[in-house]
């Protein structure tokens, strides 16, 4: 897990806290096989989305970018005014991460080799 997190977040001294939060999120999603609500993730890492949105969403954003987690937004109810309320769900997708890694690495190396000639 350390190599994957190092690949995603790098080795910047300030990335340590983000890596630890991302690791907690990944372990939680790996145990829960199906889609997990954002509220459950919030309880697991013990950081409020309203109080500290950047601390909460930075690890999720990076994990989504690298396709280690997938997200879907579903309508879960209606307000009194008749508007839909939505909940975001996340799921651990290691197979999509490997495909993303293979495709981007191949494209990057191919581009550099063409420039080298």
Task: Enumerate the language-model features and the residues they cover.
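Alpha-helical recognition domains of nuclear gene-regulatory proteins
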Residues: 28, 44, 59-62
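Short, amphipathic alpha-helical interaction segments positioned at domain boundaries
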Residues: 86-117
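Short, Lys/Arg-rich nucleic-acid/phosphate-binding segment
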Residues: 72-87
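Short acidic, hydrophobic short linear motifs in intrinsically disordered regions
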Residues: 34-46
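Short amphipathic alpha-helical interaction segments
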Residues: 49-66, 71
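Short alpha-helical segments that sit at the start of domains
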Residues: 1-28
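Short helix-to-turn junction characteristic of helix-turn-helix DNA-binding domains
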Residues: 29-33
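Short, well-structured alpha-helical interface segments that form or flank functional binding sites
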Residues: 16-24, 36, 51-58
């Amino acid at each position: 897990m350390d190599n994957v997190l190092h690949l995603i977040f790098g080795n910047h001294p300030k990335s340590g806290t983000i890596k630890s939060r991302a690791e907690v999120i990944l372990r939680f999603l790996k145990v829960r096989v199906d889609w997990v609500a954002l509220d459950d993730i919030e309880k697991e890492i013990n950081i409020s989305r309203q109080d500290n949105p950047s601390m909460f969403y930075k690890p999720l954003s990076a994990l989504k970018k690298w396709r280690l987690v997938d997200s879907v937004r579903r309508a879960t109810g209606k307000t009194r005014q008749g508007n839909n309320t939505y909940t975001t769900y996340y799921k651990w997708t290691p197979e999509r991460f490997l495909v993303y890694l293979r495709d981007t690495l191949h494209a990057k190396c191919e581009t550099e080799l063409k420039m080298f000639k």
